[in-house]
């Protein structure tokens, strides 16, 4: 039943996309003169209206002598004007891709709508191309990345949207390394990506530490990186927990400081027990390898994006023609964490988005 409904929905969407009645609205009059000049402004306007690639827009305008409406109709017929219709749909699945060049390592998050497309070969190839392009440029601007090389990546994205039929977006770029430091990366199941930057040591060591970060999700790199405001907030929280214990003030103060140190040890990377061996801290691991922590960046697919939760029970009841549906299950929520940990996560803006970069 669900498959049939999906097919009907796809058919309806496709019909509206290619309907001859549907028209795009343009800011300038269309031209009917022969051999009209195809200007950059005209190409830009057609591209913004249809979502098609730059070269496709130019070819269509050239074919129809600058008649922008005729060119738009042609792009629609060819299925190249679909990308903009997908842009408002939620894209919370995807892939984290990694690439290195010139002494730096980058992570790129590319989003799509379903995990099925996230596993598609064409989608994976596009994500890898985006990472390679990001590694070849300066900075971490998504806008600059998409506009590089004559909008090559943006055109590839629009073409992939047209081919696959889902909203696909390059969401963010993270970069580390300057050539004078050592960087490494670890990507877990294409969904969690970590960059680690150290002074001294090897790329393999960076990768091992990155694997630890992926698993343990520390909030900070070192205790020195924890903002003073966050420490005071946690101290106030811990004090409120024990101030009614009836114990003397000096004992309460010692309890608070002890719990605060435990909080810092649990939430700072170098203070955590190294997950692969459980016999030393990350700080000790770095020391044994003659390395010093500079920082890390951790990103995960879809974090910070609100996903649509389908009410399957209500859908079935509606299709059955009535009857009150049973309450739908709640949206999936993260597992409960200790109050101190939850408070720590709320205290850092970067951590709220799970794009953790320290320092």
Swiss-Prot record:
Keywords: Elongation factor, Mitochondrion, Protein biosynthesis. GO terms for biological process: translational elongation. Residues 323-345 are annotated as: Disordered. It comes from the Eukaryota. It is found in: Mitochondrion. One of its GO terms (molecular function) is translation elongation factor activity. It holds the Pfam family EF_TS. Coiled coil: none annotated. Residues 323-341 have a biased composition (Low complexity). CDD domains: UBA_EF-Ts (cd14275). This protein may be expected to contain an N-terminal transit peptide but none has been predicted. Belongs to the EF-Ts family. Associates with the EF-Tu.GDP complex and induces the exchange of GDP to GTP. It remains bound to the aminoacyl-tRNA.EF-Tu.GTP complex up to the GTP hydrolysis stage on the ribosome. This is Elongation factor Ts 1, mitochondrial.
């Amino acid at each position: 039943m669900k498959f049939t409904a999906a097919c009907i929905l796809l058919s309806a969407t496709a019909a509206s996309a290619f309907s001859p009645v549907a028209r795009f609205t343009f800011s300038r009059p269309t031209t009917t003169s022969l051999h009209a000049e195809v200007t950059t402004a005209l190409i830009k306007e057609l591209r913004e209206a249809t979502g098609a690639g730059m070269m496709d827009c130019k070819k269509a305008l050239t074919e129809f002598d600058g008649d922008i409406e005729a060119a738009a109709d042609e792009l629609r017929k060819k299925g190249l004007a679909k990308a903009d219709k997908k842009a408002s749909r939620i894209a919370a699945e995807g892939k984290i891709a990694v690439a290195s060049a010139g002494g730096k390592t980058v992570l790129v998050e590319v989003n799509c709508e379903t995990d099925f497309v996230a596993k598609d070969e064409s989608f994976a190839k596009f994500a890898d191309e985006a990472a390679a392009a990001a590694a070849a440029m300066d900075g971490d601007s998504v806008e600059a990345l998409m506009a590089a090389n004559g909008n090559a990546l943006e055109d590839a994205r629009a073409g992939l949207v047209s081919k696959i039929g889902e909203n696909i977006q390059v969401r963010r770029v993270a970069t580390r390394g300057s050539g004078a430091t050592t960087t490494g990366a670890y990507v877990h199941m294409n969904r969690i990506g970590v960059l680690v930057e150290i002074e001294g040591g090897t790329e393999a060591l960076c990768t091992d530490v990155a694997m630890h970060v992926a698993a343990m999700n520390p909030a900070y790199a070192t205790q020195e990186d924890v903002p003073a405001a966050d420490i005071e907030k946690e101290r106030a929280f811990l004090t409120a927990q024990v101030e009614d214990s009836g114990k003397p003030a000096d004992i309460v103060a010692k309890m608070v400081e002890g719990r605060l140190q435990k909080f810092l040890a649990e939430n700072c990377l170098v203070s955590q027990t190294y997950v692969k061996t459980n016999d030393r801290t990350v700080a000790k691991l770095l020391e044994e390898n003659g390395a010093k922590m500079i920082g890390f960046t951790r990103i995960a697919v879809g974090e910070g994006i609100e996903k649509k939760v389908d009410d399957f029970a209500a859908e079935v009841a509606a299709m059955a023609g009535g009857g009150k549906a049973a309450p739908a299950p709640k949206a999936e929520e993260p597992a409960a964490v200790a109050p101190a940990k939850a408070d720590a996560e709320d205290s850092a803006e970067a951590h709220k988005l799970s794009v953790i970069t320290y320092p």
